[in-house]
Each structure stands twice: as structure tokens, then as C-alpha cells.
């Protein structure tokens, strides 16, 4: 580029460099989209805009991509490196590819015909200033909105800092030429497909139009389901029809979101400022799969785990910065207090009560509102656990909202609904101190403005945050595979509850929890906490801690828990240095070196972070525990031990493997442990390697408390085979609390009611006990003996004497 064009673009770039601060999506386009910078690259933009072109240029130069203003020279021919699909509103008033774009596509394809070695990468790019979806009334702009010069100036002036450049996966023009030819008709089709691509992309980024709130209420009131529920309300409560209708409107006011794009923009600015000061980074993985779902027109339901009230804000912030529409979020009614409630409502929150029981009108209004969100194409987010995890582990899922999601499908909607599991991880959770108190029996504080301000005042040095998108679950595909007859239950009016609904919902919920855990994120904090809590004195030398972290990291990298889980790329030493900056640990120096200590008052709180990744290390920990206690054991015996205990572990920690996969998992982990020198293999027997026994023992300690808990329940069951389920749960907790005091176990989840409830249900499902309470003493004693060999003798004596004393 030379002469007047260069001067023109430089002059135009002066105001743009001041007004525009755009983001690239994805953050590293060349790396994440697999662009090969050694091959020619051309850019395709939706319509003619020099401002868009210069904004794209700034991002290309920032990411070491070819300059779009520099033409491509191919076989002596100079061709523009960019193509505008449409000329813009100054010339055309309807969508057809501009002839020039068709000509350029044809020129590029023709070069591929004459040069078999040529392969140009065509990269569609859309530049967006602002993300306002608009309201359903009074706006006529089409989904792919074009602005004339004056409109563009005001858009850039007002929204220049709320802009992004979205790079799409490249298309190989070589493949296009080989498969479809190079004539002008193919060039026209290519332009038409590109135009459709951009229209879809804009809809995915902006979302459907927002309804006027009163219009939405009127539509809901007119629905047959709510009209019938209003009549039932009037009849059952002996009130007038108008009064019953007012009750329904009041419920809509209580439930419905009041989405505001301006509030999203303002909050994005505030959160961007806040995150940069509180967090050292927000790590996002696998967002491209969600962008693709949105582009393909899926109705997306985000299903994250629930660690903190921060989850609401963090996930919406991440989605917004990934070029996606912030979802409508199901929030607990406890958050509907001033001023948080009105703010959350404008950010997309709709409020849900803890229980629907005994209020048919409420359940009908909520179900119809949720169905309306789906039918209009809004993405939705809800926490399938029902509440925040107090232990750091996933809670058993609550299936009410998930059931309503499937019922919405049974209304006969056309858009495919896809569930997207999400793992959210933190290096610091602001409520963790409160969680520990609640697990010890303290009453949960009601959310309020003073409590919110108190929590905000404590926010500092939060380390890293992690948002990992798991494997999506298309509901239609799932139902087609597991309930082929599901379409027979479609009813556009009534909320249908076919016989297959409850077991199917339970199965989907369990699968979602597994997929959330599959996307787990190891980090400096949870790895250091795991190692230090494994030490009985909660302290290790820096060298020992480094060695232990190396063990964990090698296990996770060389035998990954799943393809969606993430492990830090940093070294053990770098992770320890980062964790020490979090001010959770103490360092004592002596003449030999550093000793890193987890203070007693912090130990209980740090179990929360250890539990975040317990599922990722439980299998190698269990194997290490078995090998350590037996000193040497055959592969077959090791597998028998693991298979006997695995059903309980799978249910408790939502592990991913089926029983038939265990042999290959054990082999892979054993090979890695042998490679690390933790064990040796002699005549198909696994032996402890004495030179690395400390590392193996610390690894084994990760399963210690779980095995002790199982030993308690199996001993009680063996000692009293006729014990009923509720008594078994209660007595197991009592013994666990006693064990916790006598042996200094600082893990609040050790005697958590939910953990023992889940365990007893699994024992029923596995046939150890029946609904009537009768157990098979020979089988339970066999498992107890196995567990007794894996725990220390003093713990075993405490368990057995506790029941004898009664």
C-alpha cells in the first residue's frame, strides 16, 4: 500500500486509535483456530467499512497475523487481502453479494485452478461495535445491521470500547476448488454462504430481541396453562378471578428478569476494573465449542458447578468477553434483596424459590416463563446443584429445573436444546470461612446488604480464576438414544410428566455432574493444599513439597483425568511461589532450608480447595494406599480391591469411568507410577520403592479419609445387619465426628450428612443393603476387612470400640 491510500488510512486511524479499544475473539486467533501463517491468508468481512477494516488491522498486527492492507502477490497477480461481502447501505438496500466480492472470490479460485500447490486460507471476520439486541417493538434493523457513515461515527464514538473482532475458523480455498470447482457460480455460492455465516454470527453474539416486560406478562397470562392455573387458584382459595390473576402477575414480577444491555455494559466496565485488581487472571478453556453451538442455532443451557456467589458475575463476564450473549440466570430468591436484586435482574437473573410444593400457580407460572425463554431463543443458566457447595465437592444434583427444561422440549419447540456443563474453579473463595462454620453447625446467615458489603470488604488477592466448558449434551440426541418414543409425549399446552421423565432426568443430571468434573482445573492452590493436608503435621520442606507437586503434575499430564481437564503448564517451583503469594501458608527458615506450613486455623478452610480436585487424584491415591499397606500386591489383587470400592467412589465424586474401563486405567496409572520410581514391577507384582516411599505415602493420604469413612459404615453394617438406612446414616456420622476429634481430622466433609446419605444410597444400589434394611453380613464383613487393612490400627480400634461402647 502506498501513496494516497496510505495517507488516507493513517488519517482515518488517528481518531480510531483513540476511540476504539477492541478485543479479539478468540484471544489468540492463530493458535486457537490453527491458522498457518506460512500459507496465504485472506480476510472476509460482512460489509464495506473502512473503520472495521482498520480495527481488524490493529488486531492482526497485535497477533502477528498478516496485515489486511498489504495485498497478496500470487503468481505475479496482486489481489486485495480482504473482501467485503456487501457494499453497505450507501449503494444497496437489500442483501445480495456485491459483484466485486464475487469477482474477487472467482479470481482467487481461478488461481487455485492454475496453481495446484496454492492453498489460501479464507478467514471470515466480523467487527462489532456494541451488542444491544434491541426491543421487539419499534426497531426494524435486520439481524446483520449495516450502518451508514454518520451512524458508524456515533456507534464508534459511543461503543468503540465495547467492540470486538471475531475471527472464525478458516476455509481452505484449495479444498473448495478441488471439491466444487472454480467457476463463477461457485464464487457466488461462496459469497452467499459467507453472508449467512455473518448473520448467524451476529445473532449468536447479540441474541434475539428483548420483549417489553408487560407484553411478556400479557402473553404468559394468555397461555392456556396459566389461565387454567388462575381458575384453579380462584376456585381453591375462593377469591375472584381478577384477584387470582393479580396473584399470577405478582409471581411474574417476582420471577422475571428485566434484561438491560446498558446495565451489562456498565457492569462489564466495573467488573473489568475489579477483576484486574482482584484476580491475577481468568483462565477460560473450550469456549470455541460453545461459540459453535450458538452459531449453529442451538438453545444453550449453561449448567455450571456452584462454588460462590461470584459464579453469577464471573460466568456472565466470561461469556460476554467470548462474544456470546450473557444468559438469563436462575438465581435463588434469597438474592432478591435491595440493591442486589434489581441489579441482578437487569443483568439477566430470574428468581426461583427453594421449593414449589403446595403452590400450583407458582410452579405453573415459573414453568411457563422458563418455556417462554426457550421458545424465544434466550440462553439460560442454572446451577443444577441447587446451592453453593460447602465442601468444595460437587453436591448431588437437584433436578427440578432440569425436568422443566425437558418439559419445555415436550411443548414441541423447534430449536435444539443443548446443555453445557461448566467447571468453575478459584484459588480463593470469599465464603469459605462461612462454609466451614455452617458445616460445624452454625446457622446460615441470610443474604443482605450489610452481609454483601462485609464480603466485598474482604475481597483482595484472589489469585487465578478458572472457567472450563465441558462436553456439551444435546438433549434431542440424548433422548433419541435413550427414550426413542419421547416425541409421543409432545403436548403444546399441558405440562406432561410421562413415566420415563423422572429416571431420564436423574440419568441426565448424573451425566452432567460427571461432565462438570471432567472439566476440572488443577491450580497452584489446590495442588499445594492437597500435598500439605496429606502430611500429618501439615508441613513439608520446600524440596518435599516440590517433589510431591511434581508427582501430581506428572500423573495429571501423562495420564490425564479427561481430555477436558486442565493442568498448569508452570513448574512445581513456580506453582509453590505463586501459592505462597496467596498468604495462606507460613514459611519457616532454618539453616537447612525452608519449611512450608499450613497453619492449624487455615487447615479446615484449605480442605475446600483440596476437594475441588479430589476426583482427579482419587484413583492414583487409592492405588497408592493399597500398595503402601500391602507392601507388594499382584495386578489382579490390586484390580479386585479397586473394583470393590469403585462404585462408592464413583457415586461420591462423580467419577467418569465405567467398571469395564478400570483395568486400562489401573494399568496406565501403574505404568506412570513405575516411571516416576514410586513403585517397581517384579513378576507382575507391584512393590513399594523405598527410595520414594514418602511421595507414595503422601499420594496415598489423598484417599485416607474416604477409606476411613467407608470403614465406619461397613463396620456398622457388619455389626448390625438389620440396621435401617436412616439409623445407619446417623450412626455413621456420630462415629465419624468421634473419629474426627480423637484423630485430629480437620475435614468438615468427613462427617457431612450429604456424604453419608449418598454412600448409603450407593450401598443399596449395589445390593449391600435392601430397602427393608437387611444386609448380607458376609459380604459387608469382607469389604470391611479389605478397608481395615487400608487404615491404621489406631483408627480401626476407634471405629470398632465406638460401636462396642454403645
UniProtKB/Swiss-Prot annotation:
Signal peptide: none annotated. It is found in: Cell inner membrane. The HXXXXD motif is essential for acyltransferase activity and may constitute the binding site for the phosphate moiety of the glycerol-3-phosphate. The keyword Cell inner membrane applies. The lineage of its organism: Bacteria, Pseudomonadati, Pseudomonadota, Gammaproteobacteria, Enterobacterales. Coiled coil: none annotated. InterPro entries: GPAT/DHAPAT, GPAT/DHAPAT_C, GPAT/DHAPAT_LPLAT, GPAT_PlsB, Plipid/glycerol_acylTrfase. One of its GO terms (molecular function) is glycerol-3-phosphate O-acyltransferase activity. This is Glycerol-3-phosphate acyltransferase. It comes from Salmonella typhimurium (strain LT2 / SGSC1412 / ATCC 700720). One of its GO terms (cellular component) is plasma membrane.
Amino acid at each position: 500500500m502506498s501513496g494516497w491510500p496510505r495517507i488516507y488510512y493513517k488519517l482515518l486511524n488517528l481518531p480510531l486509535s483513540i476511540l476504539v479499544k477492541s478485543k479479539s475473539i478468540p484471544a489468540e486467533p492463530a493458535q486457537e483456530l490453527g491458522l498457518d501463517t506460512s500459507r496465504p491468508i485472506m480476510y472476509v468481512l460482512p460489509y464495506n467499512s473502512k473503520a472495521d477494516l482498520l480495527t481488524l488491522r490493529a488486531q492482526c498486527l497485535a497477533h502477528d497475523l498478516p496485515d489486511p492492507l498489504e495485498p497478496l502477490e500470487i503468481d505475479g497477480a496482486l489481489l486485495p487481502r480482504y473482501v467485503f461481502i456487501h457494499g453497505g447501505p450507501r449503494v444497496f438496500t437489500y442483501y445480495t453479494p456485491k459483484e466485486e466480492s464475487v469477482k474477487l472470490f472467482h479470481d482467487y479460485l481461478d488461481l487455485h485452478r492454475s496453481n495446484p500447490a496454492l492453498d489460501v486460507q479464507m478467514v471470515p471476520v466480523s467487527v462489532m461495535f456494541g451488542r444491544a439486541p434491541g426491543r421487539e417493538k419499534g426497531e426494524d434493523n435486520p439481524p446483520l445491521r449495516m450502518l451508514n457513515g454518520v451512524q458508524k461515527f456515533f456507534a464508534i464514538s459511543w461503543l468503540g470500547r465495547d467492540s470486538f473482532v471475531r475471527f472464525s475458523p478458516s476455509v481452505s480455498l484449495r479444498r473448495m476448488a478441488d471439491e466444487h470447482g472454480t467457476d463463477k457460480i461457485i464464487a457466488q455460492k461462496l459469497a452467499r454462504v459467507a453472508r449467512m455465516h455473518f448473520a448467524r454470527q451476529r445473532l449468536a453474539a447479540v441474541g434475539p430481541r428483548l420483549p417489553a416486560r408487560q407484553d411478556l406478562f400479557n402473553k404468559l397470562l394468555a397461555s392456556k396453562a396459566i389461565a387454567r392455573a388462575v381458575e384453579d387458584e380462584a376456585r381453591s382459595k375462593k377469591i375472584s378471578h381478577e384477584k387470582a390473576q393479580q396473584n399470577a402477575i405478582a409471581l411474574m414480577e417476582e420471577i422475571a428478569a428485566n434484561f438491560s444491555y446498558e446495565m451489562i455494559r456498565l457492569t462489564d466496565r466495573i467488573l473489568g476494573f475489579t477483576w484486574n485488581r482482584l484476580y491475577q487472571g481468568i483462565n477460560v478453556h473450550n469456549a470455541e465449542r460453545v461459540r459453535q453451538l450458538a452459531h449453529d442455532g442451538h438453545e444453550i443451557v449453561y449448567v455450571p458447578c456452584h462454588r460462590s456467589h461470584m459464579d453469577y458475575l464471573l460466568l456472565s463476564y466470561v461469556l460476554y468477553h467470548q462474544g456470546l450473549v450473557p444468559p438469563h440466570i436462575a438465581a435463588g430468591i434469597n438474592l432478591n434483596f435491595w440493591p442486589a436484586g434489581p441489579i441482578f435482574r437487569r443483568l439477566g437473573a430470574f428468581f426461583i424459590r427453594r421449593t414449589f410444593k403446595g403452590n400450583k400457580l407458582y410452579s405453573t407460572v415459573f414453568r411457563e416463563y422458563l418455556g417462554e425463554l426457550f421458545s424465544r431463543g434466550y440462553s439460560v443458566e442454572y446451577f443444577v446443584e441447587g446451592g453453593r457447595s460447602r465442601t468444595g465437592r460437587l453436591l448431588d444434583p437437584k433436578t427440578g429445573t432440569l425436568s422443566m427444561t425437558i418439559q419445555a422440549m415436550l411443548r414441541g419447540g423447534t430449536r435444539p436444546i443443548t446443555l453445557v456443563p461448566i467447571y468453575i474453579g478459584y484459588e480463593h473463595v470469599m465464603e469459605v470461612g462461612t462454609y466451614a462454620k455452617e458445616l460445624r453447625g452454625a446457622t446460615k446467615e441470610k443474604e443482605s446488604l450489610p452481609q454483601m458489603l462485609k464480603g466485598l470488604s474482604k475481597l483482595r488477592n484472589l489469585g487465578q480464576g478458572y472457567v472450563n466448558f465441558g462436553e456439551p449434551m444435546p438433549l434431542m440426541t440424548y433422548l433419541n438414544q435413550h427414550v426413542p418414543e419421547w416425541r409421543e409425549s409432545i403436548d403444546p399446552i399441558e405440562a406432561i410428566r410421562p413415566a420415563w421423565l423422572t429416571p431420564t432426568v436423574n440419568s441426565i443430571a448424573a451425566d452432567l455432574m460427571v461432565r462438570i468434573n471432567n472439566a476440572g482445573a488443577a491450580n497452584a492452590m489446590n495442588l499445594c493444599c492437597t500435598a500439605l493436608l496429606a502430611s500429618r503435621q501439615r508441613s513439608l520442606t520446600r524440596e518435599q513439597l516440590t517433589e510431591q507437586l511434581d508427582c501430581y503434575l506428572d500423573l495429571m499430564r501423562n495420564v490425564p483425568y479427561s481430555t477436558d481437564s486442565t493442568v498448569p503448564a508452570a513448574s512445581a517451583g513456580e506453582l509453590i511461589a505463586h501459592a505462597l503469594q496467596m498468604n495462606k501458608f507460613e514459611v519457616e527458615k532454618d539453616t537447612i532450608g525452608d519449611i512450608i506450613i499450613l497453619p492449624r486455623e487455615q487447615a479446615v478452610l484449605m480442605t475446600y480447595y483440596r476437594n475441588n480436585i479430589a476426583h482427579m487424584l482419587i484413583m492414583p491415591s487409592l492405588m497408592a494406599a493399597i500398595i503402601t499397606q500391602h507392601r507388594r500386591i499382584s495386578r489382579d489383587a490390586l484390580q479386585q480391591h479397586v473394583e470393590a470400592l469403585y462404585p462408592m467412589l464413583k457415586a461420591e465424586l462423580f467419577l467418569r469411568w465405567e467398571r469395564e474401563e478400570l483395568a486400562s486405567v489401573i494399568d496406565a496409572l501403574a505404568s506412570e507410577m513405575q516411571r516416576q520410581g514410586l513403585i517397581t514391577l517384579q513378576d507382575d507384582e507391584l512393590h513399594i520403592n523405598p527410595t520414594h516411599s514418602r511421595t507414595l505415602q503422601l499420594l496415598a493420604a489423598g484417599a485416607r479419609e474416604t477409606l476411613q469413612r467407608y470403614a465406619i459404615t461397613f463396620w456398622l453394617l457388619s455389626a448390625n445387619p438389620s440396621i435401617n438406612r436412616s439409623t445407619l446414616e446417623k450412626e455413621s456420622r456420630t462415629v465419624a465426628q468421634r473419629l474426627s476429634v480423637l484423630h485430629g481430622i480437620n475435614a468438615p466433609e468427613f462427617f457431612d450428612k450429604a456424604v453419608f446419605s449418598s454412600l448409603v444410597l450407593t450401598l443399596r444400589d449395589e445390593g449391600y443393603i435392601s430397602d427393608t434394611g437387611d444386609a448380607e453380613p458376609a459380604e459387608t464383613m469382607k469389604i470391611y476387612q479389605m478397608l481395615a487393612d487400608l487404615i491404621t490400627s489406631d483408627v480401626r480400634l476407634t471405629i470398632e470400640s465406638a460401636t462396642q461402647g454403645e
